[in-house]
């Protein structure tokens, strides 16, 4: 992620400072990273969103980005209590405390008890299949799909979505095709796909996906984070300039 120049002002060290809000993440197993910032900046908003849901919210960075970009009520759902508490603290410290709410429970429990339907659902979901043990149970919950596999995410997102709702995800490239295929099973039609590379001469490492309940022509493109001189590319800068402090 972009770092401040050496002569820049001193910033808090327990989180990440963006242009309009600060995200404390020292009590969250998964820290603020480029993937969430990309997803929150990349996805196109229609402008009429009333309710937005961030699944696996963690520190709340995606929910906060949605609050900055819209006038919607934004809910986060996070199963890990420590992360959920810090996410709620971040919400309360933001410019939009009345529009942000964190729910501390599993997506399965949230979906079963939620009477609301969402215009937009966003998620940077767990991405590793269960394997090598993590240092803590909280980190395993944040990283491994056994706590929330992609099929369950797609199914519950469909249950929580409006009839014309949309779902935006960021995934490792190796998981993207499977999620697109599984999405069709749950009525999610791919609308937009962006392949993300560190640089033009590097392999694709992440995929940004936008699904809708209503089918439409698929838009596909590629995003290079850095240019040939290893500086942040103009496209990446323009996409994230409302958030990154030093763009």
From Swiss-Prot:
SUPFAM superfamilies: S-adenosyl-L-methionine-dependent methyltransferases. GO terms for cellular component: cytoplasm. It comes from the Bacteria. It holds the Pfam family MTS. The keyword Transferase applies. It catalyses: adenosine(37) in tRNA1(Val) + S-adenosyl-L-methionine = N(6)-methyladenosine(37) in tRNA1(Val) + S-adenosyl-L-homocysteine + H(+). One of its GO terms (molecular function) is nucleic acid binding. Keywords: Cytoplasm, Methyltransferase, S-adenosyl-L-methionine, Transferase, tRNA processing. It is found in: Cytoplasm. InterPro entries: DNA_methylase_N6_adenine_CS, SAM-dependent_MTases_sf, Small_mtfrase_dom, tRNA_Adenine-N(6)_MTase, tRNA_adenine-N6_MeTrfase. Its EC number is 2.1.1.223. GO terms for biological process: methylation; tRNA processing. The keyword Amino-acid biosynthesis does not apply. Specifically methylates the adenine in position 37 of tRNA(1)(Val) (anticodon cmo5UAC). HAMAP family: tRNA_methyltr_YfiC. Belongs to the methyltransferase superfamily. tRNA (adenine-N(6)-)-methyltransferase family. This is tRNA1(Val) (adenine(37)-N6)-methyltransferase. It comes from Edwardsiella ictaluri (strain 93-146).
């Amino acid at each position: 992620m972009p770092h401040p120049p050496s002569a820049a002002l001193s910033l808090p060290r327990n989180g990440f400072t963006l242009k309009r809000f600060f995200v404390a993440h020292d009590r969250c197993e998964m820290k603020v990273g480029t993937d969430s910032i990309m997803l929150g900046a990349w996805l196109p908003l229609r402008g009429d969103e009333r309710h937005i849901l961030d699944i696996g919210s963690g520190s709340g960075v995606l929910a906060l980005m949605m609050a900055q970009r819209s006038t919607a009520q934004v809910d986060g759902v996070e199963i890990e209590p420590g992360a959920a508490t810090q996410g709620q603290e971040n919400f309360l410290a933001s410019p939009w405390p009345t529009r942000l709410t964190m729910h501390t429970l599993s997506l399965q429990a949230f979906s079963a008890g939620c009477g609301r339907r969402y215009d937009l659902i966003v998620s940077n979901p767990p991405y590793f299949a269960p394997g090598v043990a993590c240092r803590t149970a909280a980190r395993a919950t944040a990283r491994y799909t056994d706590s929330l596999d992609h099929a369950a995410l797609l199914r519950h997102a469909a249950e929580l979505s409006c009839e014309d709702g949309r779902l935006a995800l960021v995934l490792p490239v190796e998981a993207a095709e499977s999620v697109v295929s599984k999405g069709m099973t749950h009525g999610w039609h791919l609308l937009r796909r962006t392949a993300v590379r560190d640089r033009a001469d590097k392999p694709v490492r992440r995929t940004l996906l936008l699904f809708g309940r209503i089918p439409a022509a698929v838009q596909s493109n590629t995003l290079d984070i850095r240019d040939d001189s290893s500086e942040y590319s103009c496209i990446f800068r323009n996409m994230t300039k409302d958030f990154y402090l030093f763009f």
